[in-house]
């Protein structure tokens, strides 16, 4: 017959071991949860990047764009132009991402809540590549980031090949503003960068400015051969504004672009004011507009 004391000791030992093992698993699970990033993306461009890098998000912007399946039930934090600091802080994020072009939108309310967003520079294709590489390294997604950069570089090579030994067309880029007419996009803007990569010559250049006020006399003097009209916000309204402007202002009818029917409308989801993961399709489209196969004067 077994000694009751020994049986009790064995039982106690087993319970202690199981407790230690269970506690160890619980500790590991807690540590894993603490290491998991809690990322809030406040623009659709950042959501696209996160999706390509297979990153988890706890907050996404309120947008008319179709979110990737994995983020469709994630908490909405408001529009990119006016995100809710209350909703963001409630999510206890480890990182909040926006873009440099919207840095002015994050003011005193965010500072008061000690929320410091990271502003990603997506003003050019090169900056998008750098952002992918940096985020890939930070979140251990180097392979996924390298894959996306490779796709972008392939698209750049294809556009360059298409433009070889062909005269560069003069291109005017306009950005429509709902209810406020339009601005001229320079070579420093994202679409301006697409024009450069596609082999075109932007008729308005700047060292620092992405956008500038339009001037009829200056536009007429440059006589653009191609006009690209960006309508990324409220496209239906902006397209009507552009159509009315081009109808009422006789200056446009004198440009080579209008005479030869080379005015193109750029809309989401392919085109936006900032670089995004539709860049390869966008660059290919601009390349074909600038260098059509045949039948169009350049």
Language model: regions and residue ranges:
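A short, structured surface patch at a secondary-structure boundary
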Residues: 38, 43-91, 95-100
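Flexible loop/hinge segments that line or gate small-molecule binding clefts
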Residues: 67-69, 102, 106-138
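Structured C-terminal subdomain patch of bacterial secreted/periplasmic proteins
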Residues: 37-38, 129-137, 146, 150, ...
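Sec-dependent N-terminal signal peptides of Gram-positive bacterial secreted proteins and lipoproteins
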Residues: 3-30
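Alpha-helical, coiled-coil/dimerization segments enriched in small aliphatic residues
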Residues: 63-66, 70, 183-211
């Amino acid at each position: 017959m077994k000694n009751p004391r020994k049986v009790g000791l064995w039982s106690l030992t087993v319970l202690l071991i199981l407790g230690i093992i269970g506690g160890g698993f619980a500790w590991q699970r807690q540590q894993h949860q603490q290491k998991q990033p809690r990322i809030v993306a406040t623009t659709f461009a950042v959501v696209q990047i996160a999706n390509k890098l297979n990153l988890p998000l706890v907050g996404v912007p309120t947008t008319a764009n179709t979110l990737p399946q994995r983020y469709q039930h994630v908490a909405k934090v408001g529009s990119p132009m006016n995100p809710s600091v209350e909703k963001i802080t409630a999510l206890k994020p480890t990182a909040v991402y926006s873009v440099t072009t919207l840095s002015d939108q994050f003011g005193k309310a965010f500072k008061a809540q000690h929320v410091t967003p990271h502003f990603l520079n997506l003003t050019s294709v090169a900056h998008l590549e750098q952002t992918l590489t940096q985020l890939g390294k930070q979140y251990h997604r180097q392979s996924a980031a390298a894959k996306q950069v490779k796709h972008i570089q392939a698209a750049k090579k294809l556009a360059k090949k298409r433009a070889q030994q062909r005269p560069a067309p003069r291109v005017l880029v306009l950005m429509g503003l709902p209810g406020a007419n339009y601005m001229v996009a320079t070579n420093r803007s994202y679409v301006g960068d697409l024009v450069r990569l596609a082999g075109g010559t932007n008729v308005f250049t700047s060292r620092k400015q992405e956008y500038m006020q339009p001037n009829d006399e200056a536009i007429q003097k440059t006589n653009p051969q191609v006009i690209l009209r960006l309508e990324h916000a409220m496209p239906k309204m902006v397209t009507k504004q552009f159509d009315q402007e081009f109808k009422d202002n006789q200056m446009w009818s004198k440009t080579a672009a209008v005479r030869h029917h080379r005015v193109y409308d750029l809309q989401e989801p392919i085109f936006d004011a900032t670089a995004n993961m539709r860049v390869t399709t966008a660059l290919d489209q601009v390349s074909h507009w600038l260098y059509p196969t045949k039948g169009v004067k350049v």
